[in-house]
Amino acid sequence: MRKIIHVDMDCFFAAVEMRDNPALRDIPLAIGGSRERRGVISTANYPARKYGVRSAMPTAMALKLCPHLTLLPGRFDAYKEASAHIREIFSRYTSLIEPLSLDEAYLDVTHSPHCYGSATLMAKEIRQTIFDELQLTASAGIAPIKFLAKIASDLNKPNGQYVITPEEVPGFLRTLPLGKIPGVGKVTAAKLESLGLRTCEDVQKSDLAALLKRFGKFGRVLWERSQGIDDREISSDRQRKSVGVERTLAEDIHEWAECEAIVELLYPELERRLAAVQPDLRIARQGVKLKFNDFQLTTQEHVWPKLNKEDLLATARKTWEERRSGRGVRLVGLHVTLLDPQIERQLVLGL
């Protein structure tokens, strides 16, 4: 049985700003683009969240909800420096680390000798070390299954942790709302509920063939997660084939300007992850992914040896205009595929 820890920093970008400027600690604060440039919120602190401000929300909407919101453009060098320090702390416990973004990662500590082999104690020690060395708080989830560790990390936020033992998995899944499964947003959850599927137990009782017919590949993923099946390995840097970043949206978008703002938000994150790749790796292809409100997924990519925002924006617009067919979009993603000239095969760095 595996021991997986998911560590998620608490409102990371905003937390770095509050650490470096204590005057920001108790006021609504968000990191994001300006309203005039149709910006999008990247991160909001907890005082801002009380007003309903959330990540991926248009800045204009955030300012309507919280007119006195303090908006900062972000200091990504500072966030990257803190993220590298956090990653080094993880490496003291295991080499099996899969970063999902600058502020969260999976750790496989199944064979780690630290803390007498206790994943619970390791998570507690990691969180305390992060606070001692960076004055930032983290939350953690511990479970034998990858996606359950991610769900668990959100159950005792901020600055807490939650454990799902192997014996607790069946009972936990039985009552788990489908909207808690990573990748199942509010719109999808509402559609599933309209079909009588509200919890994992409802899906457990469903026919897999019927789910596949209605939802395609998503139906299989939904069925497997509801059964507690998630065999995905922790992908360390040397195993990864691509760099990508994506965002599942709280509400479907129907205007190109909204999609353009999401691409603008995601691009700096893609740049940062690409910069972490070994220098002998170069780009083979880059592309865009859109998921529509009928669960269909489309990707479009082409050969392009250098990362370029304008090229990705053009690809996104072409995909939007040619393949959307009036449908709402619930997920936007950017990715590059990497080529290793030394061994002539693709390697990965996932998000």
Swiss-Prot record:
Enzyme Commission number(s) of this protein: 2.7.7.7
Gene3D superfamilies, per the entry: 3.30.70.270, 3.40.1170.60, 5' to 3' exonuclease, C-terminal subdomain, DNA polymerase, Y-family, little finger domain
Keyword Magnesium found: yes
GO BP term, example: error-prone translesion synthesis
Catalyzed reactions per annotation: DNA(n) + a 2'-deoxyribonucleoside 5'-triphosphate = DNA(n+1) + diphosphate
Main location, first listed in the record: cytoplasm
Keyword Signal in annotation: no
EC class of the enzyme, as a word: transferase
Cofactor: record remark: Binds 2 magnesium ions per subunit.
Cofactor list: Mg(2+)
Keywords: Cytoplasm, DNA damage, DNA repair, DNA replication, DNA-binding, DNA-directed DNA polymerase, Magnesium, Metal-binding, Mutator protein, Nucleotidyltransferase, Transferase
Domain UmuC: 4-185
InterPro entries found in the cross-reference section: DNA/RNA_pol_sf, DNA_pol_Y-fam_lit_finger_sf, DNA_pol_Y-fam_little_finger, DNA_polymerase-Y, DNApol_IV, IMS_HHH_1, Rev_trsase/Diguanyl_cyclase, UmuC
Localisation per UniProt entry: Cytoplasm
Pfam families listed in its UniProt record: IMS (PF00817), IMS_C (PF11799), IMS_HHH_1 (PF21999)
HAMAP family xrefs: DNApol_IV
Known role: Poorly processive, error-prone DNA polymerase involved in untargeted mutagenesis. Copies undamaged DNA at stalled replication forks, which arise in vivo from mismatched or misaligned primer ends. These misaligned primers can be extended by PolIV. Exhibits no 3'-5' exonuclease (proofreading) activity. May be involved in translesional synthesis, in conjunction with the beta clamp from PolIII.
Similarity-based family: Belongs to the DNA polymerase type-Y family.
Subunit structure: Monomer.
Protein's recorded name: DNA polymerase IV
Source taxonomy: Bacteria, Pseudomonadati, Pseudomonadota, Gammaproteobacteria, Enterobacterales
Gene expressing this chain: dinB
